[in-house]
Amino acid sequence: MRKFWVALSSIEEIDSSFIQRLFNYFGDIESVFNASDLSGIEGLSVKKAENFLRLRDRVDVDKVYQAVVDRGINFLTFDDGNYPLMLRNIDDPPSVIYYKGNLSDCNFDRTLAVVGSRRATSYAREALSQIISELNGTDICIVSGLASGIDTTAHVSALDNNLKTIGVIASGFDYTYPAANKELYKRIEDGSGAVLTEYYPTFQPIKFRFPQRNRIVSGLSYGTLVAEASLKSGALITANLTLEQGRELMCIPGLITN
């Protein structure tokens, strides 16, 4: 059954919400992959149904599944009992979570998302580092997006203080973005935490995927800490998602001179 989830997630032209819609209708993922008639799905146009069937029938299930295995990538599917409950309960949960590292080491009852500017000020970085250092000795897991700036500070501070950390990336594992964080990826994967993504390994870090991944950052977490953000930033997108998901939202006060 797991390979059918992977096969569907390998189709770039569809997203998790569409896969979930089909899964909810048919009741199991193998039926989704083998279905020939989608006419009973309310609101699904004939054109979209035909396009999906055409794309699906091109997929070599065993080949795309084996490509994940050969890369040493672990994964959880939406119907897996180990799929994080907090993430399952959001409006648009990822159909598959691909990951490297030790996801099972993370306490999903003690998760804190950290978001902020890629061009963070020294004040924001220092304030965040101090806050995270005071969590040393707890089992809190820091969740962020492995971008430059605040994300990097959050992950490094977590690791330096013996905390678990999860990096949620906006591409498949064939890509490292930003390239400057290659060693940080490895440090997380080899240490106390995991790097994860909803994207099949070959999917590139395209611009629209960055705001998409933000729902996972907040969705994995009981609360979100905004360290620093501009008015139209991805950090504020995550902040809004946090409120929509009914989670706690916190922020580091800015300098009164800023």
What do these predicted ranges mean?
Residues 78-258:
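Glycine-biased, small-residue-rich flexible motifs in mid-sequence functional cores and linkers
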